[in-house]
UniProtKB/Swiss-Prot annotation:
Compartment(s): Membrane
Organism taxonomic ancestry: Bacteria, Bacillati, Bacillota, Bacilli, Bacillales
Family membership: Belongs to the dicarboxylate/amino acid:cation symporter (DAACS) (TC 2.A.23) family.
Membrane-protein topology: Multi-pass membrane protein
Alphabetical list of InterPro entries matching this protein: Na-dicarboxylate_symporter, Na:dicarbo_symporter_sf
Role this protein plays: Mediates uptake of L-cystine, the oxidized form of L-cysteine.
Membrane spanning stretches: 1-21, 33-53, 72-92, 104-124, 183-203, 224-244, 262-282, 337-357, 369-389, 393-413
Domain of life according to the entry: Bacteria
Alphabetical keyword list: Amino-acid transport, Membrane, Transmembrane, Transmembrane helix, Transport
Record organism: Bacillus licheniformis (strain ATCC 14580 / DSM 13 / JCM 2505 / CCUG 7422 / NBRC 12200 / NCIMB 9375 / NCTC 10341 / NRRL NRS-1264 / Gibson 46)
Keyword Membrane: yes
Protein name (database record): L-cystine uptake protein TcyP
GO cellular component: plasma membrane
Chief place of localization: membrane
Length: 461
């Protein structure tokens, strides 16, 4: 370890101490995260220009910074499966009207899939409007390595037929899926939790005493898991600082500049899709301004943390402040982690498909091709994880199904973190919109709670 590496680590520790002081002074969580984001960008640029992105000093410094950044991501990954499982199961135990459960879950899943299909169409329109093509993107060493890695993953997936892939969604060994060992582990855990939830409803009708005991156990575990999530989320400012510093310091800024058009096109599509969410809320007879005010804190958190799973507790609390019953809020938030993510599983893979199409001789304006892309994107949106890598998995599924070279998806590695922030915020907005619209359609929405504009949930951890 050189003197310069030691100095860089000391500076990072000093910046973390500053964030800790802000926490002690009770500065709001959102402000602390945004401060960490800003400081990380500035510090990253400073390191980049002083040492150079490929220098030995930066390589060693990044390894040390990764203790905070990578450690934070690992902790989020640790809690995802227990969080998804207990949230789905808790949704069943918290439902007060059990006769509507099929309609409620069907509506939520239907809305998530439908909005993902719309998101795919928006992504296609944006890619065509900005004339995005993979042949216009330079391929450096990092992009080539990433492409080879994606190619290997794709080959592993292509070894199975479509019926076999559908069977793979089922939890043959739920304990294995709790480890996240398979690409479809998330949706498998959702299915397992749903089976337990349905079994609970049956026992509740015939043996209410045993069901009540099970409910208390689930509620207790739910409280413990949510507390663990809170403990992990307290590390968010430090994790964001380390991740952004490392990302900027090690990035090829020339590549980012060249991919600027893709970043702009992505955010244009994300904004259009967010407006569509607001239109859905408006057509449901609700004031979209109220939704914006109440949803802002959780969307900011999702944007800065880049974790739909980490945002789940705040997502559910925000839905409750919007008048969504607790059971529906749990369903919408939990399903939204693994089904129909508008940003990661909708817009992103659709844009990639349009970009790559000309390289394989496919006309991206062919109507039959466009409809195929939308259908494949919607179907493939099952099982996308809510922590890092979900968009990549969705892209692999879609491109493999369309017989396109997945290696070209590696060309976007340098701008992935920039786009992922917006995608995550849209994912969370999509799950909240599905819960809100479902509550309104089923007449379960507490309108007085929705209209109470003072009831705004802040991210407090």
């Amino acid at each position: 370890m050189t003197l310069f590496v030691v100095i860089n680590i000391i500076v990072m520790l000093g910046l973390m101490a500053l964030l800790y002081m802000m926490q002690k002074k009770h500065v709001s969580f959102s402000k602390r995260v945004f401060t960490a984001l800003g400081i990380g960008i500035v510090f990253g640029f400073a390191l980049h220009f002083i040492y150079g992105s490929s220098s030995e000093t930066i390589t060693q410094t990044s390894d040390w910074f990764n203790i905070a950044g990578g450690g934070y991501v690992k902790l989020l990954q640790m809690i995802v499966m227990p969080l998804v499982f207990i949230s789905i199961l808790g949704a069943f135990t918290k439902l007060k009207l059990t006769h509507n459960i099929g309609k409620i879950s069907g509506l939520i899943i239907g809305l998530l899939i439908a909005t993902t299909a719309v998101a795919a169409a928006v992504g296609i329109a944006s890619a065509l409007a900005f004339d995005l093509q993979a042949v216009h993107v330079d391929q450096g060493q990092a992009e080539t390595m990433r492409g080879a890695e994606l190619e290997q993953k794709s080959q592993d997936m292509e070894a199975k037929t479509l019926p076999q892939q559908i069977v793979e969604l089922l939890p043959g060994n739920p304990f294995l899926d709790f480890t996240g060992a398979r690409p479809t582990s998330t949706i498998a855990v959702v299915i397992f939790a749903a089976f337990l939830g349905i079994a609970y409803l049956g026992v509740n009708r015939k043996q209410p005493e045993q069901a009540e005991l099970f409910k208390k156990m689930v509620d207790a575990v739910y409280a413990i898991i949510m507390r663990v999530v809170t403990l992990i989320l307290r590390l968010t400012p430090y994790g964001v600082l380390a991740i952004m510093t490392k990302t900027i310091a090690t990035s090829d800024l020339d590549s980012i500049a060249k991919l600027g058009k893709f970043v702009i096109a992505s955010y244009a599509a994300l904004i259009v899709m967010f407006i569509i969410h607001l239109l859905l809320i408006t057509f449901s007879g609700l004031n979209p301004v109220t939704y914006l005010k109440k949803a802002f804190p959780v969307l900011v958190f999702a944007f800065t943390s880049r974790s739909s799973a980490g945002a789940l507790p705040l997502n559910i609390k925000t839905q409750r402040s919007l008048g969504v019953p607790e059971g529906i809020a749990n369903f919408a938030g939990s399903f939204g982690l693994s089904i129909g993510q508008n940003g990661c599983a909708g817009i992103y893979p659709a844009m990639l498909a349009i970009m790559i199409a000309p390289t394989v001789g496919q006309n991206p304006l062919d109507p039959s091709f466009l409809f195929t892309v939308i259908a494949v994107v919607a179907i493939s949106s099952f099982g996308v994880a809510g922590v890092g890598g979900g968009a990549t998995f969705a892209a692999l599924l879609v491109l493999s199904a369309l017989n396109m070279p997945v290696a070209l998806a590696g060309l976007l590695i340098s701008v992935e973190p920039l786009i992922d922030m917006g995608r995550t915020a849209l994912n969370v907005s999509g799950s909240m919109t599905s819960g809100l619209v479902t509550s309104k359609v089923t007449n379960e929405l507490e309108k007085d709670t929705y209209q109470d504009r003072t009831n705004i949930i802040e991210a407090e951890v």
